Amino acid sequence: MGMNQQRLTQVILAPIVSEKSNVLAEKRNQMTFKVLANAAKPEIKAAVELLFGVQVASVTTVTTKGKTKRFGRTLGRRSDVKKAYVSLAAGQELDLEAAAAAADKE
């Protein structure tokens, strides 16, 4: 399965910053990302390794269904979101702020 680099740069949409993701990052060395809905686990692993230069131990994904919300009298629905919990290999560290700063310089 050949994964082209352009696709890999588009797989990860954004890091998820929340109370839960911060606890996972500190205690389990897991990073949380919002990813494309059709992204596969091997793709996510390759994308994180390519973009951040770290070794990935495992990837767990979950698709969160969008909530139904009202806008006046009309019903609308938020988009479904796919999250990836990426476990880094022992001894690996990922600093998102440093990675973002490096990406801005390029």
Swiss-Prot record:
Identify the Pfam families for this entry.
Ribosomal_L23
UniProt KW keywords = Ribonucleoprotein, Ribosomal protein, RNA-binding, rRNA-binding
Report if keyword Ribonucleoprotein is assigned. yes
Q: Which InterPro entries match?
A: Nucleotide-bd_a/b_plait_sf (IPR012677), Ribosomal_uL23-like (IPR013025), Ribosomal_uL23/eL15/eS24_sf (IPR012678)
A GO term from the CC aspect:
ribosome
A GO BP entry is: translation
A Gene Ontology molecular function term for this protein is: structural constituent of ribosome
Q: Subunit info?
A: Part of the 50S ribosomal subunit. Contacts protein L29, and trigger factor when it is bound to the ribosome.
Family designation: Belongs to the universal ribosomal protein uL23 family.
Q: What does this protein do?
A: One of the early assembly proteins it binds 23S rRNA. One of the proteins that surrounds the polypeptide exit tunnel on the outside of the ribosome. Forms the main docking site for trigger factor binding to the ribosome.
Q: What is this protein called?
A: Large ribosomal subunit protein uL23
Natural source organism: Neisseria meningitidis serogroup C / serotype 2a (strain ATCC 700532 / DSM 15464 / FAM18)
